[in-house]
Amino acid sequence: MSAPDSPALAGMSIGAVLDLLRPDFPDVTISKIRFLEAEGLVTPRRASSGYRRFTAYDCARLRFILTAQRDHYLPLKVIRAQLDAQPDGELPPFGSPYVLPRLVPVAGDSAGGVGSDTASVSLTGIRLSREDLLERSEVADELLTALLKAGVITTGPGGFFDEHAVVILQCARALAEYGVEPRHLRAFRSAADRQSDLIAQIAGPLVKAGKAGARDRADDLAREVAALAITLHTSLIKSAVRDVLHR
């Protein structure tokens, strides 16, 4: 289906686009949209007055980009590849103009590669109480208590948990069926903390530079390095397991 250009959505100002996106993406800003334009991911036309005018297709691309970053933690170069895989000037042939295209494999990627499920991390910023976490994960309170004591799961501001805690709990429960106890999972937490410190060292200087769009560039750099780190970690584990099994 070709990109729609209805009177209601054609030629929107950047402020109108911001209002359209914010219900689903509360953290989006005008500077973020301008940054994505500077990166060539969206190309609004310019009115005779010089102001940006966004079409429905531009808005759909923005929604795709923001969702891919938030829900899959993808760096911009991977998102760009996903968008380039779509027919030029077209939106998905199903649903409304704001239904996003499904992510397609990036050329050269194999299972477990960058941009695949192994490198996907949700960043929706959900805050869960202890009761909410237990309900969502369907895990016994005793396991959560043990994971907290072992430092595998931590709480954020106000004592709330994020959405990653749900996945951690479910994985811990599954591993428990193989005799893996919470204390055994400390090594995973320690490795994750060391890797996040390394990513912060790489991306942090961009934020401190204080240039326009610096925070967005640092955020994308962190996503890219994190995706590579996740893929590397997964491959190292697979390689080590193979070596152990074939000794």
Curated annotation (Swiss-Prot):
Residue ranges for the DNA-binding region feature of this UniProt entry: 14-38
Name recorded for this polypeptide: Uncharacterized HTH-type transcriptional regulator Rv1828
CDD domains: HTH_MerR-like (cd00592)
InterPro entries, per database record: DNA-bd_dom_put_sf, MerR-type_HTH_dom, MerR_fam
Protein's UniProt keywords contain Transcription regulation: yes
The keyword DNA-binding is annotated on this UniProt entry: yes
Annotated Gene3D superfamilies: 1.10.1660.10
Disulfide bonds: none
Note, other: Was identified as a high-confidence drug target.
Induction: Autoregulated.
Molecular function, one GO term: DNA-binding transcription factor activity
UniProt lineage: Bacteria, Bacillati, Actinomycetota, Actinomycetes, Mycobacteriales
Protein purpose: Transcriptional regulator that binds to its own promoter and thus may play a role in the regulation of the cotranscribed genes Rv1827 and Rv1828. Can also bind several promoter regions of genes that are essential, including ftsZ. Binds to the imperfect everted repeat sequence CTCAA through its winged-HTH motif.
UniProt comment concerning the protein's domains: Contains an N-terminal DNA-binding domain, a linker region and a C-terminal effector binding domain. Dimerization is mediated via the C-terminal domain.
Any Pfam family: MerR_1
SUPFAM superfamilies named among the record's database cross-references: Putative DNA-binding domain
